[in-house]
Every structure is written in C-alpha cells, then in structure tokens.
Amino acid sequence: MNDFLNSTSTVPEFVGASEIGDTIGMVIPRVDQQLLDKLHVTKQYKTLGILSDRTGAGPQIMAMDEGIKATNMECIDVEWPRDTKGGGGHGCLIIIGGDDPADARQAIRVALDNLHRTFGDVYNAKAGHLELQFTARAAGAAHLGLGAVEGKAFGLICGCPSGIGVVMGDKALKTAGVEPLNFTSPSHGTSFSNEGCLTITGDSGAVRQAVMAGREVGLKLLSQFGEEPVNDFPSYIK
C-alpha cells in the first residue's frame, strides 16, 4: 500500500491512504443509526468501509471490486463527484457494508493495494485522458458503480474529451462480439464530466480484445493535440 499519511494515526477509523488518486480508506466499526438512516445506501449494515478520492472513479471501483471478492463485504453505495482537481473526470465515494469490522478493514486494504494496477490503463495528457478497465469476473462494486453483470466479464472504455470516447466505443464494438451495457456521456450519466464511456460484457477474451481496440484508437486520437498520453503505472490489459 502506498501510504502517505502516518500509519500510526490516532484516528481509529483510518485504514490507509494512497497518493494514487489521493485515495483514503476508512472503516466505521459501528455506525450511528441516525447517520445510517440518512446515507444513500442500498442496504443497512452496522459496519461500514469507506473508500474516497479526488481523482479517479473506475480505478477505485475496480480496486474495491477485488476487496469485495476477497471478503464478505457488500458494496452499498457508489457516488461520482465531479472532481479530478479541475480536470475532465470524477472523484469517487464508495461505501461497503458488512458485519465484521476486520473484514471491512481487509476489503479496504485490498482495494488500496490494487490501485497501482487499476490505474495502469489510465492515460493522461494536458488535453484529456483515457481510461480502460477489464475484469474476467465482475463483483458487487463493479455492478453497483458501473452496471457490470456480476460473475461475468466486464470492460470499460472511456475517453475525454467525450467525443473521443464515442469513437473508442464504436471501434471496440466493431472489433469483437461483445454486448454493450451502457454508454454514458456528459448529460447522461457521468455526473457532467467531459467523458464518453462504453461498458461491455461477453466472453472474457472478446471483452479484453474490444477494450484493447478502444485503447488503441483512443491513444491515437488524444495524441493529435500534440502530446503523447502516458500512464503512470504499467498497463494490465494485455
């Protein structure tokens, strides 16, 4: 885990934090019922895990998906603040629920430890960014946050400015026999970010191939602004 806050923090709810996306993980072992009643969660649990960040939504959701798979926690809320510190994308608020505080802490740790991987196919340039995600088996966080079908392969193909995402999605669907789940755009589902995002499902190999095809054309288009988009971590979609 890439911690930049003091690991000996006296705040008992603190689990860890990462410079990647300015992401912080916390656990409330027994949440106040009055607060729980006001939270926008799909199911009430006494123990809550929280993953919150300034930059990135898809990477944190996919990282949290691994935390869900590794524990008995359930994803009960995903929200998309318009953020990226003034960029074209999102931050994210993810809340998970369960009965065991130790399980919640483990899920948050797994998510924080996966950020370097799930940010591997985020490519940035001054003019915009691309994000690609893939999993052979989606779980509850990808389902609630991105509309994935639990237990099936899932891919996310996203471009900023949003028009690049439209072309990326078209290329992806023409490349492999996959099923489109949704297309979100600035006024339709992205919390007004300047992104076009296609989500897909289908055979694992086909989904991977489609995501890679979208990435290829997206990199070519974004580079037309005069700067090669770069990723800060090694690509994991190969």
Curated annotation (Swiss-Prot):
Location, primary (coarse class): other
Gene3D superfamilies: 3.30.70.1710
Single GO molecular function: structural molecule activity
The UniProt record lists the keyword Disulfide bond: yes
PROSITE patterns listed in its UniProt record: BMC_CP
Annotated keywords: Bacterial microcompartment, Disulfide bond
A family per Pfam: BMC
Keyword Transcription: no
Gene Ontology terms describing biological process: propanediol catabolic process
Single GO cellular component term: bacterial microcompartment
Domain BMC circularly permuted: 14-125, 126-225
Protein's pathway: Polyol metabolism; 1,2-propanediol degradation
Domain notes: Has 2 BMC domains which can evolve independently of each other.
The protein's assembly and partners: Homotrimerizes to form a pseudohexamer with a central pore 7.5 Angstroms wide and 22 Angstroms long; the pore channel in the crystal binds up to 4 glycerol molecules. A disulfide bond forms in the pore, it is not clear if this is an artifact. The trimers pack into an array.
Family: Belongs to the EutL/PduB family.
Record's function text: One of the major shell proteins of the bacterial microcompartment (BMC) dedicated to 1,2-propanediol (1,2-PD) degradation. Probably involved in a propanediol fermentation/reuterin formation pathway.
The protein's name in its UniProt record: Bacterial microcompartment shell protein PduB
Species of origin: Limosilactobacillus reuteri (strain DSM 20016) (Lactobacillus reuteri)
